[in-house]
Swiss-Prot record:
Required cofactor(s): pyridoxal 5'-phosphate
Gene3D superfamilies to which the protein is assigned, alphabetical: Aspartate Aminotransferase, domain 1, Type I PLP-dependent aspartate aminotransferase-like (Major domain)
Pfam assignment, any one: SHMT
Annotated source species: Acinetobacter baylyi (strain ATCC 33305 / BD413 / ADP1)
MF-aspect GO terms: glycine hydroxymethyltransferase activity; pyridoxal phosphate binding
Keywords from the named record: Amino-acid biosynthesis, Cytoplasm, One-carbon metabolism, Pyridoxal phosphate, Transferase
Catalysed reaction equations from the record: (6R)-5,10-methylene-5,6,7,8-tetrahydrofolate + glycine + H2O = (6S)-5,6,7,8-tetrahydrofolate + L-serine
Keyword Transferase: yes
Protein name: Serine hydroxymethyltransferase
Subunit structure: Homodimer.
CDD domains recorded: SHMT
One record GO biological process: tetrahydrofolate interconversion
Residues binding (6S)-5,6,7,8-tetrahydrofolate: L120, G124, H125, L126, S354, P355, F356
Function comment: Catalyzes the reversible interconversion of serine and glycine with tetrahydrofolate (THF) serving as the one-carbon carrier. This reaction serves as the major source of one-carbon groups required for the biosynthesis of purines, thymidylate, methionine, and other important biomolecules. Also exhibits THF-independent aldolase activity toward beta-hydroxyamino acids, producing glycine and aldehydes, via a retro-aldol mechanism.
């Protein structure tokens, strides 16, 4: 049997790093748009004895015995996901968003088929056809981008490319785009060329669940998402679809056995918890505040002379262009990190710098809103960001801002204990 010994006693080296990360999360302001803080209930499910159980297959059709309780858990997660997003089909087994996306490709395409997706350089995701990713290596990837005048998706270009290249599938969705996506326009374009429409709503799933952002679920053929980010659950994936028996069968077999073996039952349980949390009345107020906070920060930074791609935001994030300031994203990331403000460097459209340097940073408000920040706090925060950037990383300015950050973090703890 196991020795009755704690992690800190058994592996102090590892425990020390975990404790340091705990302290970092409490003392730093998190503005990475893809990060959030999940609830103790989600973490309790994720850390449960379910991690011991193997359960290849689906509820009622397993390849292992002893699955009577995990069947109940997985079915609960499926039913909640369908109810939350108004879907006819849900697969809760994907380990992550990228695995969910790869299963969709496997289900709907053959190697070499043409895919039309958003360019990574313009706000798309690796799995939307980037050359370094399976989606750009296995398939013939054509990329669309933003209108250089507006900083918004150029739907006319999407339609032109679709007519020219006749893709088998069009991918809509993003990892760094701050406006409302016109899902129906994508649907119309897909129908015009006889393509599947696949939406990756990983970044806005929480907003969609709360009715704060338009839902693509009954418009697209297939929709995927992560379950963290705005959804505020465990780091995992989810596939949703409207009713189509043929596509549902293809998706089921693409996930298992096509793309994965045994599901992570502890993660599925944590997803079930986060879906239930997203059905609570206060969840909509949270998501509304996420958007208000992003808009408030954008307003302050614009007033301080900074450029935001597309001129503002309708969701939880925005891209701050630093080209005018002659500051790199890498520099801004480091300076703000020294002030206990965590962001990520990010390319801006037509960025002259490399992806390892970039000319911008991406800012998102899901985590600070979970923490309890309102518009007053994020306006102060945006001013502090401008102070650090204006100073070009001056040590005294960074020290002053860091002290303010530590004070506000103490006032708004992530986890009370």
């Amino acid at each position: 049997m196991f020795a009755n010994i704690s992690l800190s006693e058994f592996d102090p080296e590892l425990a020390k790093s975990i404790e340091a990360e705990d302290a970092r999360q409490e003392a730093h302001i998190e503005l990475i748009a893809s990060e959030n803080y999940c609830s103790p209930a989600v973490m309790e499910a994720q850390g449960s004895k379910l991690t011991n159980k193997y359960a290849e297959g689906y509820p009622g059709k397993r390849y292992y015995g002893g699955c009577e309780y995990v069947d109940v858990i997985e079915q609960l997660a499926i039913d909640r996901a369908k109810a939350l997003f108004g879907a006819d089909y849900a697969n809760v087994q994907p380990h992550a968003g990228s695995q969910a996306n790869s299963a969709v490709y496997l289900a709907l395409l053959n190697a070499g088929d043409t895919v039309l997706g958003m360019s990574l350089a313009h706000g798309g995701h690796l799995t939307h056809g980037a050359k370094v990713n399976f989606s750009g290596k296995t398939y013939n990837a054509v990329q669309y981008g933003l209108n250089p005048e507006t900083g918004e998706i150029d739907y006319d270009e999407v339609e032109r490319l679709a007519i020219e290249h006749k893709p088998r599938m069009i991918v809509a969705g993003f990892s760094a785009y701050s406006r409302i996506v016109d899902w129906q326009r994508f649907r119309d374009i897909a129908d015009k060329v006889g393509a599947y429409l696949f939406v990756d709503m990983a970044h806005v799933a929480g907003l969609v669940a709360a009715g704060v952002y338009p839902s693509p679920v009954q418009i697209a053929d297939v929709t995927t998402t992560t379950t963290h980010k705005t959804l505020r659950g465990p780091r995992s994936g989810l596939i949703l679809a409207k009713a189509n028996e043929e596509i549902e069968k293809k998706l089921q077999s693409a996930v298992f056995p096509g793309n994965q073996g045994g599901p992570l039952v502890h993660a599925i349980a944590a997803k079930a918890v986060c879906f239930k949390e997203a059905m609570a009345p206060e969840y909509k107020a949270y998501q509304q505040q996420v958007v208000k906070n992003a808009q408030a920060m954008a307003e302050v930074l614009i007033a301080r002379g900074y450029d935001i791609v597309s001129g503002g935001t309708d969701n939880h994030l925005f891209l701050l262009s630093l080209i005018k300031q002659d500051v790199t994203g890498k520099e801004a990331d480091a300076w703000l990190g020294n002030a206990n403000i965590t962001v990520n460097k990010n390319a801006v459209p037509n960025d002259p710098r490399s992806p390892f340097v970039t000319s911008g940073i991406r800012i998102g408000t899901p985590a600070v809103t979970t923490r309890g920040f309102g518009e007053a706090e994020v306006r102060d925060l945006a001013s502090w960001i401008a102070d650090v950037l204006d100073s070009k990383g001056d040590e005294k300015v960074i020290a002053d801002v860091k002290a303010k950050v530590e004070a506000v973090c103490a006032k708004f703890p992530v986890y009370e204990n």
